[in-house]
């Protein structure tokens, strides 16, 4: 059983995946799971049940290293999930 803080990290992980999908950086969870050899069934189960003990910390590192997701945001919820994306949108605004 995951702690409440661990479940929050898991929820932010899935939120980051949704942002990446919405911004067309990834096509979806299948793209992510195939790239890193993650069992898609486990990922789908975890999304529905964040308290399950199947989350792998390496999944966070993939988001941080390969997609620029904020490690601080993933772990604490503070700041922006994708600061580079926020900065890009702000600079494009008139």
Predicted regions span which residues?
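A short, Lys/Arg-rich alpha-helix, primarily the initiator
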Residues: 1-34
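Short, charged recognition helix plus adjacent turn
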Residues: 1-8, 75-94
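Residues that mark the N-terminal boundary/hinge immediately upstream of a DNA-recognition element
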Residues: 27-28, 59, 70
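Recognition helix of helix-turn-helix/homeodomain-like DNA-binding domains
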Residues: 37-55
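Short, basic-rich loop-to-helix N-cap that marks the start of a DNA-contacting helix
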Residues: 49-65, 81
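Hydrophobic/aromatic-rich, well-ordered segments within soluble, folded domains that form packed cores
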Residues: 69-71, 75
């Amino acid at each position: 059983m995951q702690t409440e803080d661990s479940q929050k990290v898991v929820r932010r992980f899935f939120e980051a995946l949704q942002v990446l999908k919405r911004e067309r950086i990834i096509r979806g969870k299948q793209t992510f799971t195939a790239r890193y050899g993650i069992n898609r069934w486990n990922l789908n189960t975890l999304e529905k049940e964040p308290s399950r003990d199947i989350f792998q910390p390496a999944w966070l590192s993939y988001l941080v290293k390969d997609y620029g997701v904020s490690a601080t945001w993933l772990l604490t919820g503070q700041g922006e999930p994708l600061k580079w994306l926020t900065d890009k949108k702000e600079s494009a605004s008139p």
